[in-house]
């Protein structure tokens, strides 16, 4: 069984993405790892090279800044990395620059790839998600945030990244997947308040038709945490590769203030109760077809 990892990244230093931690968290499972490196204004290239692994292959790309519809440029860059994977790879393990896998899940993930290799009805493996929010000490649960997504796919070029690279499709249909008992830890919203404000501003250029607003970046250090429907204390351990970042944290999160400012409607509160009692997320968007779990 041959496994290829792949990701895309641009301006990782400027945007404080833990891309080195992301790559190294799954590198031991991979025989090769493709990094689609977009033209950057910082030291991202050296950051990747400093991982110093013969498994890593960098392909240099230029982001199409005319693609401003719903983050579609992220899917285009993902597809560039996927296309560069060696044709003899069986599985392709995708990870984004703000995601990590805890080392405790690696044996299970490897076994799932081995056990499902011969089952052609399984086109991908579906992971559970934990979204850390504002701090490494808290994670967020919300109906507006995806709780599962495909991160391992067959190395079949009929597959392509979908929408803003959240998931994948086989041509135009949903991929048939097995849900596995492993989590992706998503750290994209773990930043000091000013960093979160800047992230929202920078992301706008890839989701809004007109790109960046004409106004300068917001001067405020206050971030609106109102979309955190429920913040829960994280009582487990983080991936070992993340520990250095966690030790360097220099801000405090006022969870009590966030609780007071929550903007959870009565309808969402009711639907959350239904999910808590039954496990059923009413109206959940599913960019996949679960055929095995």
Q: Model-predicted segments: where are they?
A:
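Hydrophobic targeting segments
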Residues: 2-7, 26, 32-35, 184
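Glycine-rich, phosphate-binding/catalytic loops in enzymes
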Residues: 23, 52, 109-113
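Active-site-proximal specificity loops/subdomain of glycosyltransferases
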Residues: 3-6, 10-11, 16-21, 36-94
């Amino acid at each position: 069984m041959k496994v290829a990892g792949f990701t895309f990244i641009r301006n990782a230093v400027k945007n404080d993405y833990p891309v080195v931690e992301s790559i190294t968290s799954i590198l031991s499972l991979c025989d090769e790892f493709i990094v689609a490196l977009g033209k950057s204004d910082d030291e991202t290239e050296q950051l990747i090279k400093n991982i110093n692994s013969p498994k890593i292959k960098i392909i240099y790309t230029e982001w199409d800044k005319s693609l401003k519809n719903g983050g579609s440029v992220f899917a285009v860059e993902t597809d560039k990395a996927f296309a560069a994977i060696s044709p003899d790879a069986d599985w392709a393990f995708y990870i984004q620059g703000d995601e990590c896998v805890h080392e405790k899940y690696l044996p299970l993930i490897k076994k799932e790839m081995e056990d499902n290799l011969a089952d052609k009805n399984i086109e991908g493996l579906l992971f559970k998600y934990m979204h850390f929010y504002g701090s490494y000490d808290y994670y967020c649960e919300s109906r507006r945030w995806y709780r599962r997504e495909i991160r391992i796919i067959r190395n079949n070029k009929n597959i392509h990244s979908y929408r803003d690279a959240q998931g994948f499709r086989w041509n135009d249909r949903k991929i048939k997947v097995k849900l596995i008992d492993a989590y992706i830890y998503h750290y994209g919203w773990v930043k000091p308040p000013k960093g979160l404000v800047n992230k929202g501003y920078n992301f706008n250029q890839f989701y809004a038709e007109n790109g960046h607003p004409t106004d300068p970046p917001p001067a405020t250090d206050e971030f609106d945490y109102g979309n955190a429907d429920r913040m829960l204390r994280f009582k487990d351990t983080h991936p070992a590769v993340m520990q250095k970042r966690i030790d360097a944290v220099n801000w405090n999160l006022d969870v009590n203030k966030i609780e007071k400012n929550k903007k959870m409607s009565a309808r969402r509160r009711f639907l959350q109760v239904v999910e808590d009692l039954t496990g059923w997320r009413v109206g959940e968007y599913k960019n996949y077809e679960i055929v095995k779990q």
